[in-house]
Every structure is written in C-alpha cells, then in structure tokens.
Design a protein with these regions (language model features):
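Short coil/turn segments that connect the beta-strands within blades of beta-propeller domains
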Residues: 113-114, 165-166
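Residue position within the beta-strands of beta-propeller blades
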Residues: 116-118, 170
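Extracytoplasmic beta-rich repeat domains
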Residues: 97-110, 125-127, 143-162, 190-204
C-alpha cells in the first residue's frame, strides 16, 4: 500500500509540474549576429552579387559600321551624331533592319565599334542585365547580369551605359555600378553605392 501511495504521489507531482512548466521562459530570441558568425560568411537573401552571371551567345567578326553613340545624349551630350554617311532625310519611311525585345523601362542603348549595349531588366529573373548586340545583324553576342529584386516604378531600367575602348559601365536603378570589358563581357569590378557610400535611391 505504501508503494502504491508513493507511486501515485510521484505521478501526481510529475503531472502538476508538466502543467506548470512554461517552455518559453527558457527560449532565447534569435537575432542577427547572436551566433557571433563573422560578417560576410553567409549570403543573405537580399544580397546582390554584381555581375554574377554571364552568357555568351554568338561569335561575329567586327562590323564595318562606324556610327557611335557612347553615352547619354551622345558623345558631346548634345543629341547630335556626327557621321560621314549620308542620310536620306526625305525618305518617307525607314525599314526596320532588326529589333529585339526588352523589359519595361526607359533605358537607352549606346553604340560603339559595331556593337550595341543596353542595360535591361528581366522580370522573370529579377535581374539587371547588360546586353551586347551586333550593330550589323542584331544578334545578341553576350549578356552579364545579377539578381536584384525590385518593384515596378514607371518601369524598371532607366539608365544609359557609358563606353570607351576598355570599359563599358552601367548603373542600375538600385545604385549598382558594373564595369565590364566591351568585347568579351568579362567583369572588371562592381560597386553597390547604397552599401559602400550610404546613398539613397531617389523615387525616380
């Protein structure tokens, strides 16, 4: 009988303790940095790796076309192109030689040494993409891109690359600067202006 009473008391104490136990009192709220992991080891979901991806599409010999448009509003920033080629200004209609689809936005291309460059935005991949085309055929030669999720704000891409012999430089809508080789598409460097310089992205 004594053993039975003792057993009942033990089980009763366990049952009461189980009901009174509050597990939340022993939980620690996990916050970033609580594990003392050095910064930069773990990639966050919103991290942008500028120029992370690359695709080469076509090989094409240099074009004989000499027209150039090297940046915003042209070489002299006056919206004037100088060319020895004669343009028939009296033509009623100009045939479309080639075209390509882009994402929504207000970006414009640059033209240099027979190639066309434009900073596009791919909504399906959430990516800024520097695309290089042949001026003569319209074939895409290469593309370098990086993931940067954005919300539509009067479209997406809205800037114009700038180009010289050794560099083509872009700046994305979120302040990501990317410098590539104009011929090969190789990444030279990238800067996240928000992270490095604490800049603010304007509404427009």
């Amino acid at each position: 009988l004594l053993i039975t009473v003792a057993t009942v008391c033990i089980y009763t104490a366990i049952l009461v303790g189980w009901h009174l136990y509050v597990p939340r009192e022993n939980l620690t709220i996990q916050v970033p940095g609580a594990d003392n992991r050095p910064e930069g080891l773990a990639r966050k979901a919103n991290d942008v790796v500028i120029g992370e991806y690359f695709m080469k599409y076509e090989e094409e010999p240099p074009s004989g076309l000499t027209g150039e448009w090297t940046g915003f509003r042209g070489e002299r920033f006056d919206n004037v192109v100088e060319t020895p080629d004669k343009i028939n200004t009296e033509a009623g209609d100009y045939p479309v030689v080639w075209s390509f689809e882009t994402g929504e936005g207000h970006a414009a291309p640059v033209i240099y040494k027979g190639r066309v460059y434009v900073l596009d935005y791919n909504e399906s991949l959430n990516s800024d993409a520097l695309r290089c085309f042949s001026l003569e055929s319209g074939k895409e030669l290469w593309r370098r891109w990086y993931r940067v999720p954005m919300k539509r704000n009067h479209g997406f891409s809205r800037t114009v690359p700038v180009i010289r012999d050794e560099y083509v430089i872009t700046i994305g809508p979120q302040g990501h600067v990317m410098c590539c080789d104009p011929v090969t598409g190789d990444l030279k460097w990238g800067i996240d202006m928000q992270k490095q310089f604490k800049t603010e992205v304007p509404f427009w």
